[in-house]
Design a protein with these regions (language model features):
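Conserved nucleotide-sugar donor-binding catalytic segment
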Residues: 24, 78-163
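Glycine-rich, basic loop-to-helix element that forms the pyrophosphate-binding segment
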Residues: 10-26, 47
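C-terminal subregions of glycosyltransferases and related glycan-biosynthesis enzymes
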Residues: 71-73, 123, 130, 135-207
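Acidic donor-binding segment of Leloir-type glycosyltransferases
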Residues: 1-9
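Short aromatic/hydrophobic "clamp" motif used to bind/position activated sugar donors
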Residues: 31
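The conserved acidic donor/metal-binding loop of glycosyltransferases
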Residues: 35-39
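Conserved donor NDP-sugar-binding/catalytic core segment of glycosyltransferases
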Residues: 43-73
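Acidic donor-diphosphate engagement hotspot in glycosyltransferases and nucleotidyltransferases
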Residues: 19, 40-45, 56, 120, ...
Length: 207
């Protein structure tokens, strides 16, 4: 079948700007994201689209590489994981290339923050999860970065210090938007710092 593909060229302004350009040109009722070094398994979209039939689900992600479901997430009786803001503040899930969501997400939550270079996808997921229904499937549907682990390898995610700044900014944003209270804000700021120190230790061990 003939594919309706639009190729857009623009100067490199970061991943958020590139994604936003694509989002602004998209015309369908559903939107899926795919980064340049990632790969969907053939049945990815057909598996995820079935979950939109219920009507109340707005955003569907899935697992990638060797990811496993862990605290604070668990599979519910309907066979998927409910993703909420507080859970995302504990642990970010839903790699960008696993995401499919309804167009109304853009109308309700806007676009990626083009001024934020690190953890910008997590920032957007948090905004979405606050007032839209987001789920994650217990299925590995995407291969990212050639299957490499996400910590300690080349690429944006290897810059742990900048990732930490992005994570702290995300918590600040959630507080400024009124999505979390003062006690939650203090707790998640400290918790993020502990996770950062843990990552540093892991990287030193791996090297």
């Amino acid at each position: 079948p003939e594919l309706n593909i639009t190729l857009i060229n623009q100067l490199n302004g970061g991943v958020s700007k590139a994604r936003n350009t694509g989002l602004k040109h998209a015309t369908g009722d559903f939107i899926a994201l795919l980064d340049s070094d990632d790969e969907w398994i053939p049945e990815k979209t057909s598996i995820q689209m079935k979950y939109f039939d219920s009507g109340n689900i707005d955003f569907v992600t899935a697992l990638r590489n060797n990811d496993k479901i862990s605290f604070p997430y668990s599979v519910n009786e309907r066979g998927y994981v409910e993703v909420t803001l507080n859970k995302l503040l504990f642990k970010i899930v839903g790699h960008t290339s696993t995401a499919i969501f309804k167009r109304k997400i853009l109308e309700k939550h806007g676009y990626f923050d083009e001024n934020q270079r690190y953890s910008e996808d997590a920032n957007y997921w948090m905004k979405v999860s606050h007032s839209s229904v987001m789920i994650m499937l217990n299925k590995k549907l995407v291969i990212t970065g050639g299957g490499k682990p996400s910590i300690g390898h080349s690429g944006l995610s290897s810059n742990i210090e900048e990732m930490e700044k992005g994570a702290q900014k995300n918590i600040d944003d959630m507080k400024n938007l009124g999505y979390i209270n003062v006690l939650e804000y203090i707790f998640f700021k400290l918790f993020a710092k502990i996770k950062y120190i843990r990552r540093i230790i892991i990287i030193k061990i791996l090297r």
